[in-house]
């Protein structure tokens, strides 16, 4: 069994995550489920002894049913947040994520059969980049980053603790 690089200590939770920025026809692929009131990026925890590159390719395939190739590392994101419900309820969360820009396939065809760790079916949504600000979507930097993408790796720190 593989293990995510994640741990909880007292009221603190930490995770090392790899995530994908998948864009097709000026739309970004985001994920949602019936237990959450927001959308989130494709991706998940990096396993022990797994590179972030291998993790993002694995997660993308697990969630979309499609093999995407990495274009480049786009963003290193340090995120501080907390949740009012779910398995992270009452925890101070710290997540470090590597966001990879994936090479476009030229179509939006997916073969998704993805579920959350709690067993809830995940749905995939192609959201026009120009409409991202109309959605509650995480990470919150997506709209501004995608409006002016950079060629170099960007380091972003967000603190969304309530």
Residues covered by each model-derived region:
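Acidic, metal-coordinating catalytic segment for phosphate/diphosphate chemistry
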Residues: 1-19, 25, 90, 157
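A generic structural micro-feature
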Residues: 12-14, 88-96, 116-121
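Short, well-ordered beta-strand micro-motif
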Residues: 22, 101-103, 126-128
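Conserved Nudix-box catalytic region and its N-terminal flanking loop in Nudix hydrolases
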Residues: 24-66
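Short, charged/polar surface micro-motifs in flexible loops or helix N-caps
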Residues: 26-28, 36-37, 47, 76-82, ...
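Nudix hydrolase/Nudix homology domain
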Residues: 34-38, 113-162
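A short coil-to-beta-strand element that immediately follows conserved catalytic motifs
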Residues: 67-76
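Active-site-adjacent beta-strand/loop module that shapes the phosphate/pyrophosphate-binding cleft
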Residues: 81-111, 145
